[in-house]
From Swiss-Prot:
GO terms for biological process: spermidine metabolic process. Its EC number is 2.5.1.46. GO terms for cellular component: cytoplasm. Keywords: Hypusine biosynthesis, NAD, Transferase. Spermidine binds at residues 121-122, 233, 280, 306-308, 315-321. SUPFAM superfamilies: DHS-like NAD/FAD-binding domain. Catalyzes the NAD-dependent oxidative cleavage of spermidine and the subsequent transfer of the butylamine moiety of spermidine to the epsilon-amino group of a specific lysine residue of the eIF-5A precursor protein to form the intermediate deoxyhypusine residue. Belongs to the deoxyhypusine synthase family. One of its GO terms (molecular function) is deoxyhypusine synthase activity. It catalyses: [eIF5A protein]-L-lysine + spermidine = [eIF5A protein]-deoxyhypusine + propane-1,3-diamine. Its cofactor is NAD(+). This is Deoxyhypusine synthase. The active site is at residue 321.
């Protein structure tokens, strides 16, 4: 072999011949800001420019497409729309994304909601006191000595939770009174988590609240883990205050209610921000109808640990929670960074905002 020739074994290893790409293969496209010179750049400009960028930019644009198709559907016989289940974790209500979630509920863009206890109480607490920016590296012991509770790079003064107790306990008293007065009557009151949230949404009477709008628009809000947070603390304290009488909250009636909504849906769509109970509760309801027709997951969890949060949509297909052949995507992004862009190009776009 001549010194000026590449060894054949090296050439065979490195210079592998490519096949012809199939007809219609999408090329990677670049976002060229020169195209927007001399005019304002819109959200639509950005999303269209990111569509074929690759990685999570393309996944986010796929989420936009799926949600827009979700919203455009009409049953050919009844003209019924897609039943859209929205799920989100409590930290998103603590963050400024709360306003985006409130917008969806205020304008009746979703059919039902599932969240955690924190996702309920933090909404009401933010009507009673402010949440502040902090730092992910703020020292826990220092914050504890100052009565400040950290949520990522946010802090909530402990006094906000005291204000929440002052507000919610009299309502719990009234609910117990109504429950006891109805015993043995034809209209006996059976409180459920969704009924409790509905009542609190009415009582807060504040347009900044997500659940005020859920009450006003009669959008059911489910919280199977209602006791897992400050609201649970208040219910615990109330058991002593009210003893021997006890407020009863029935989770069985609520599981029947959410599953029935899924079963009766002409078409079901899931938009789930975060993971855990909010993700699985919606997916499991859709199992009752052999799966949702479309799904958008937005979270940063990985699947290698077998967690519910990390699971991709295809895992839900294996369980019958998303239909075979359904339109689904998982966007591996933190929801506060991704969801405002998605809403701007879906729900808010129709509203002309």
């Amino acid at each position: 072999m001549a010194d000026n020739q590449i060894p054949s074994s090296v050439a065979d290893a490195v210079l592998v011949k490519s096949i012809e790409m199939p007809e219609g293969s999408q090329k990677v496209e670049e976002l060229d800001f020169n195209k927007f010179k001399g005019r304002p750049i819109t959200v639509d400009d950005l999303l269209q420019g990111m569509k074929h960028m690759g990685f999570q930019a393309s996944s986010m644009c796929e989420a936009v497409r799926i949600i827009n198709e979700m919203r455009a559907y009409r049953d050919p016989t009844t003209s019924e729309k897609t039943t859209i289940f929205l799920g989100y974790t409590s930290n998103l209500i603590s963050s400024g994304l709360r306003g985006t979630l409130r917008y969806l509920v205020q304008h009746k863009h979703v059919s039902a909601i599932v969240t955690t206890a924190g996702g309920i109480e933090e909404d009401f607490i933010k009507c009673l006191g402010d949440t502040y920016m902090s730092s992910f590296s703020a020292v826990g012991a220092d914050l504890r000595s100052k009565g400040l509770n950290r949520i990522g790079n946010l802090v909530v003064p402990n006094s906000n939770y005291c204000a929440f107790e002052d507000w919610v306990v009299p309502i719990l008293d009234k609910m117990l009174e109504e429950q006891e007065a109805s015993r043995g009557t034809e209209n006996e009151i059976n409180w459920t988590p969704s009924k409790v949230i509905h009542r609190l949404g009415k009582e807060i009477n504040d347009e900044r609240s997500v659940y005020y709008w859920a009450w006003k628009n009669d959008i059911p809000v489910f919280c199977p883990a209602l006791t897992d947070g400050s609201l649970g603390d208040m219910l615990y304290f109330h058991t002593f205050k009210a003893s021997p009488k006890q407020l009863r909250i029935d989770i069985v009636e609520d599981i029947r209610k959410i599953n029935t909504i899924a079963v009766r849906a002409k078409r079901a769509g899931m938009i789930i921000l975060g993971g855990g109970i909010v993700k699985h509760h919606i997916a499991n309801a859709c199992l009752m109808r052999n799966g949702a027709e479309s799904a958008v997951y937005i979270n940063t969890a990985q699947e290698f640990d077998g967690s519910d949060a990390g699971a991709r949509p295809d895992e839900a297909v294996s369980w019958g929670k998303i239909k075979v052949g359904a339109d689904a995507v998982k966007v591996y992004m933190e929801a506060t960074a991704a969801f405002p862009f998605i809403v701007a190009n879906t729900f808010a776009k129709e509203d002309g905002l």
